[in-house]
């Protein structure tokens, strides 16, 4: 029974399932119910399982403990007597011994254990004093919040609080830096936005800005101007109506000048039309307010001149920005360049900075004017980017302009302002004529030919050209690259140049064929001449560093050096002869080796003559191969011929162990079977990016290679700087 009990506990705790198997659990309860000894034995088995470094095994063991705790007084007594150890293994009250992985199962175990302790205290707390003490110990000393869903311990809570405080401090510091940056950059951002808005207005005026071309008259001047215009435009207006000529918007009378006469009033009273009644009702308020009302004729004229059917409706004009396209020309190039520069600045610098400010303020929990100002800046920047996109600017083709250095004349003009005029000295002759040079004791100056002058001019020009080609910012460098890519012009002229000395070239080739060029030594180079004194050295009788008589110097000839000048090594490889024979050693698949090595095959050793079947022709070679074959068979294991699958079938049929478990195929290691395959493999779970990098970086071979490379670097440095005191100590 004890063996069966241990087997059941092992199977239940190593199943790796979140719920216990009901059949085995029922059998375990039945065995524990049979005697107190079995129950005590089950308690010790479960306590051993709780000590395992695997959260799934502990969780399954805790579930068994929970089932037995609610059914047996003896089991409760045993568990409460060692309650502190139980809490350390399930709740993790000892921060030095945390719960083992997997982490999710460990968290689940802690929550279930805390809930179980709370339930046991409510149900059995009065009967078991140690249980009540354990509950209060968790609540008061370990500060375990039984209402906390995550069931965190004090150490975990403290760690999280400290981590949160550190994060808050970091975010506050970043928010302060962001506030400082915003205060420094806000003025620049506002200036850039104003510049973009002004450029937009210059490129495309706002259709709803009606005062864009107004002259800005003062009120008094405007009223007087209106009166003069109305007085002057009245006769023209009447004339236009009578002559039925096309009118202009400037000639249309304003509503205030359309005065209703008495005659019009009588006509209006006589005509009783519904539309006119509605019109009278609408204009009644205008009459009461003192504003002149239009008559019938004036109203019809007003409507006809303005192209309106009635003045009671409004027109909504929608201007689509999809068809807008601004083309760059000579007039707006400067404006477009300014807009493009400002757009690049906003897109690459200002908008990312503002977005980072908003993110930092949000993380730091700032909800005051700083966040509102940042959001306002972001909205304005995004609106400017949208407007730039809607403008749909088409740029002209831009050519690369290379900035060249200013000429010498320009430098002289700039530097002339820095010089002070000085009067010339008396008797100073910058140029002395040729007939007076003898009097001054000077030689005659040789006359330069025109060719020399031309050569000097060409040299200066080529020098300046070379300097321009070396300068990567100059256009000459670009032209040089293009010329290099083009086919060489001299290639076309080479055939014409080679046609002239064709006979000389043929003669040279014939002579070279007769007498090929070979390397030679110095003795052949100076053949028939005085040989160089390479082997002679000066010998000093005195070995003192400073005091040595110069008269006693004597030359000593070193025979070894002179012999080295006259000796040479000539290697004769001979004529290449291709290999015609083959290895023809028998292969495992029955074929013959087709390698054509000259002396030795890398797989079958020295090449020997064989027949068509691969059998050695010489008797000695045959005897040697037979001996090697017997030795190889003796060293091979006896089980090589056995097939593991066939042996397992024979074992299953006969029931006799033929040793199939000992064989593991050809040349392979026997894989270790997992002890508990249903549990989560902790080693496989730890296969993270960090662990994989650790395997590669801290591999023994890699560490050895790194150490070897570093030692070589140190050795090279030591050899290079060994005589310097600064590096000798390193």
Swiss-Prot record:
It comes from the Eukaryota. It is found in: Chromosome. The keyword Ubl conjugation applies. A zinc finger (UVSSA-type) spans 580-607. One of its GO terms (biological process) is response to UV. Pfam families: DUF2043, UVSSA_N. There is a cross-link at residue 425 (Glycyl lysine isopeptide (Lys-Gly) (interchain with G-Cter in ubiquitin)). PANTHER family: UV-STIMULATED SCAFFOLD PROTEIN A (PTHR28670:SF1). Factor involved in transcription-coupled nucleotide excision repair (TC-NER), a mechanism that rapidly removes RNA polymerase II-blocking lesions from the transcribed strand of active genes. Acts as a key adapter that promotes recruitment of factors involved in TC-NER. Facilitates the ubiquitination of the elongating form of RNA polymerase II (RNA pol IIo) at DNA damage sites, thereby promoting RNA pol IIo backtracking and access by the TC-NER machinery to lesion sites. This is UV-stimulated scaffold protein A. It comes from Gallus gallus (Chicken).
């Amino acid at each position: 029974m004890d063996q069966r009990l241990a087997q059941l506990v092992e199977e239940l705790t190593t199943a790796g399932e979140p719920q216990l198997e009901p059949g085995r659990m029922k059998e375990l309860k039945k065995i524990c119910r049979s005697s107190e000894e079995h129950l005590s034995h089950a308690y010790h088995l479960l306590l051993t399982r709780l000590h395992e470094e695997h959260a799934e095994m502990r969780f399954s063991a805790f579930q068994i403990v929970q089932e037995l705790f609610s059914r047996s007084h003896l089991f409760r007594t045993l568990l409460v007597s060692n309650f502190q150890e139980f809490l350390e293994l399930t709740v993790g009250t000892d921060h030095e011994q945390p719960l083992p992985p997997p982490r999710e199962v460990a968290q689940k175990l802690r929550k279930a254990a805390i809930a179980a302790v709370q339930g046991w205290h409510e149900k059995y707390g009065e009967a078991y004093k140690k249980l009540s003490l354990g509950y209060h110990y968790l609540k008061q000393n370990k500060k375990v919040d039984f209402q906390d869903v995550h069931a965190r311990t004090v150490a975990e809570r403290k760690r999280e609080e400290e981590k949160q405080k550190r994060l808050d401090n970091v975010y506050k510091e970043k928010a302060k830096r962001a506030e400082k940056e915003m205060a420094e950059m806000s003025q620049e951002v506002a200036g850039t936005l104003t510049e973009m808005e002004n450029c937009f207005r210059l490129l495309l005026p706002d259709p709803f800005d009606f005062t864009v071309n107004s002259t800005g008259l003062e009120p008094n001047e405007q009223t007087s101007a209106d009166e003069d215009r109305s007085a002057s435009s009245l006769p023209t207006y009447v004339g236009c109506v009578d002559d039925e000529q096309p009118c202009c918007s400037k000639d249309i009378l304003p509503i205030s000048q359309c005065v209703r006469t008495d005659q019009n009033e009588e006509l209006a009273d006589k005509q009783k039309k519904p539309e006119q009644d509605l019109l009278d009702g609408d204009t009644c308020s205008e009459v009461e307010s003192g504003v002149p009302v239009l008559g019938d004729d004036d109203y019809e004229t007003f409507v006809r001149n303005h192209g309106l059917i009635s003045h009671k409706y409004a027109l909504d004009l929608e201007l689509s920005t999809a068809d807008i396209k601004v083309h760059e020309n000579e007039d707006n190039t400067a404006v477009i360049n300014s807009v493009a520069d400002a757009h690049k600045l906003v897109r690459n610098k200002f908008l990312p900075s503002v977005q980072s400010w908003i993110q930092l303020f949000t993380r730091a929990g700032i909800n005051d004017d700083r966040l509102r100002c940042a959001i306002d800046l972001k909205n304005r920047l995004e609106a400017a980017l949208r407007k730039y996109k809607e403008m749909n600017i088409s740029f002209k083709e831009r050519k690369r302009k290379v900035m060249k250095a200013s000429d010498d004349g320009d430098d002289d003009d700039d530097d002339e302002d820095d010089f002070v005029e000085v009067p010339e000295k008396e008797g100073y002759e910058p140029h002395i004529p040729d007939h007076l040079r003898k009097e001054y004791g000077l030689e005659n100056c040789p006359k330069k030919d025109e060719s020399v002058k031309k050569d000097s001019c060409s040299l200066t020009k080529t020098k300046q050209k070379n300097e321009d080609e070396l300068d990567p910012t100059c256009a000459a460098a670009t032209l040089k690259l293009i010329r290099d890519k083009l086919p060489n012009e001299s290639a076309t002229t080479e055939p014409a140049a080679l046609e002239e000395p064709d006979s000389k070239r043929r003669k040279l080739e014939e002579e070279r064929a007769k007498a090929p060029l070979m390397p030679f030594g110095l003795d052949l180079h100076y053949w028939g001449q005085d040989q160089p004194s390479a082997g002679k050295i000066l010998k000093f009788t005195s070995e003192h560093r400073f005091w040595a008589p110069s008269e006693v110097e004597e030359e000593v000839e070193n025979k070894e050096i002179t012999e080295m000048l006259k000796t040479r090594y000539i290697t004769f490889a001979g004529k290449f002869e291709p290999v015609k024979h083959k290895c023809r050693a028998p292969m495992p698949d029955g074929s013959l080796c087709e390698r054509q090595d000259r002396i030795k095959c890398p797989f079958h050793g020295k090449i020997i003559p064989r027949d068509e079947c691969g059998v050695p022709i010489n008797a000695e070679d045959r005897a040697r191969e037979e001996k090697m074959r017997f030795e190889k068979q003796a060293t091979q294991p006896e089980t090589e011929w056995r097939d593991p699958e066939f042996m397992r079938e024979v074992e299953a049929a006969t029931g006799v162990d033929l040793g199939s478990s000992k064989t593991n195929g050809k040349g392979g290691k026997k894989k270790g079977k997992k002890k508990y395959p249903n549990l989560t493999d902790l080693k496989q779970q730890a296969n993270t990016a960090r662990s994989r990098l650790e395997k590669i970086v801290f591999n023994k071979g890699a560490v050895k290679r790194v150490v070897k490379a570093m030692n070589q670097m140190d050795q090279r440095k030591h050899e290079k700087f060994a005589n310097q005191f600064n590096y000798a100590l390193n």
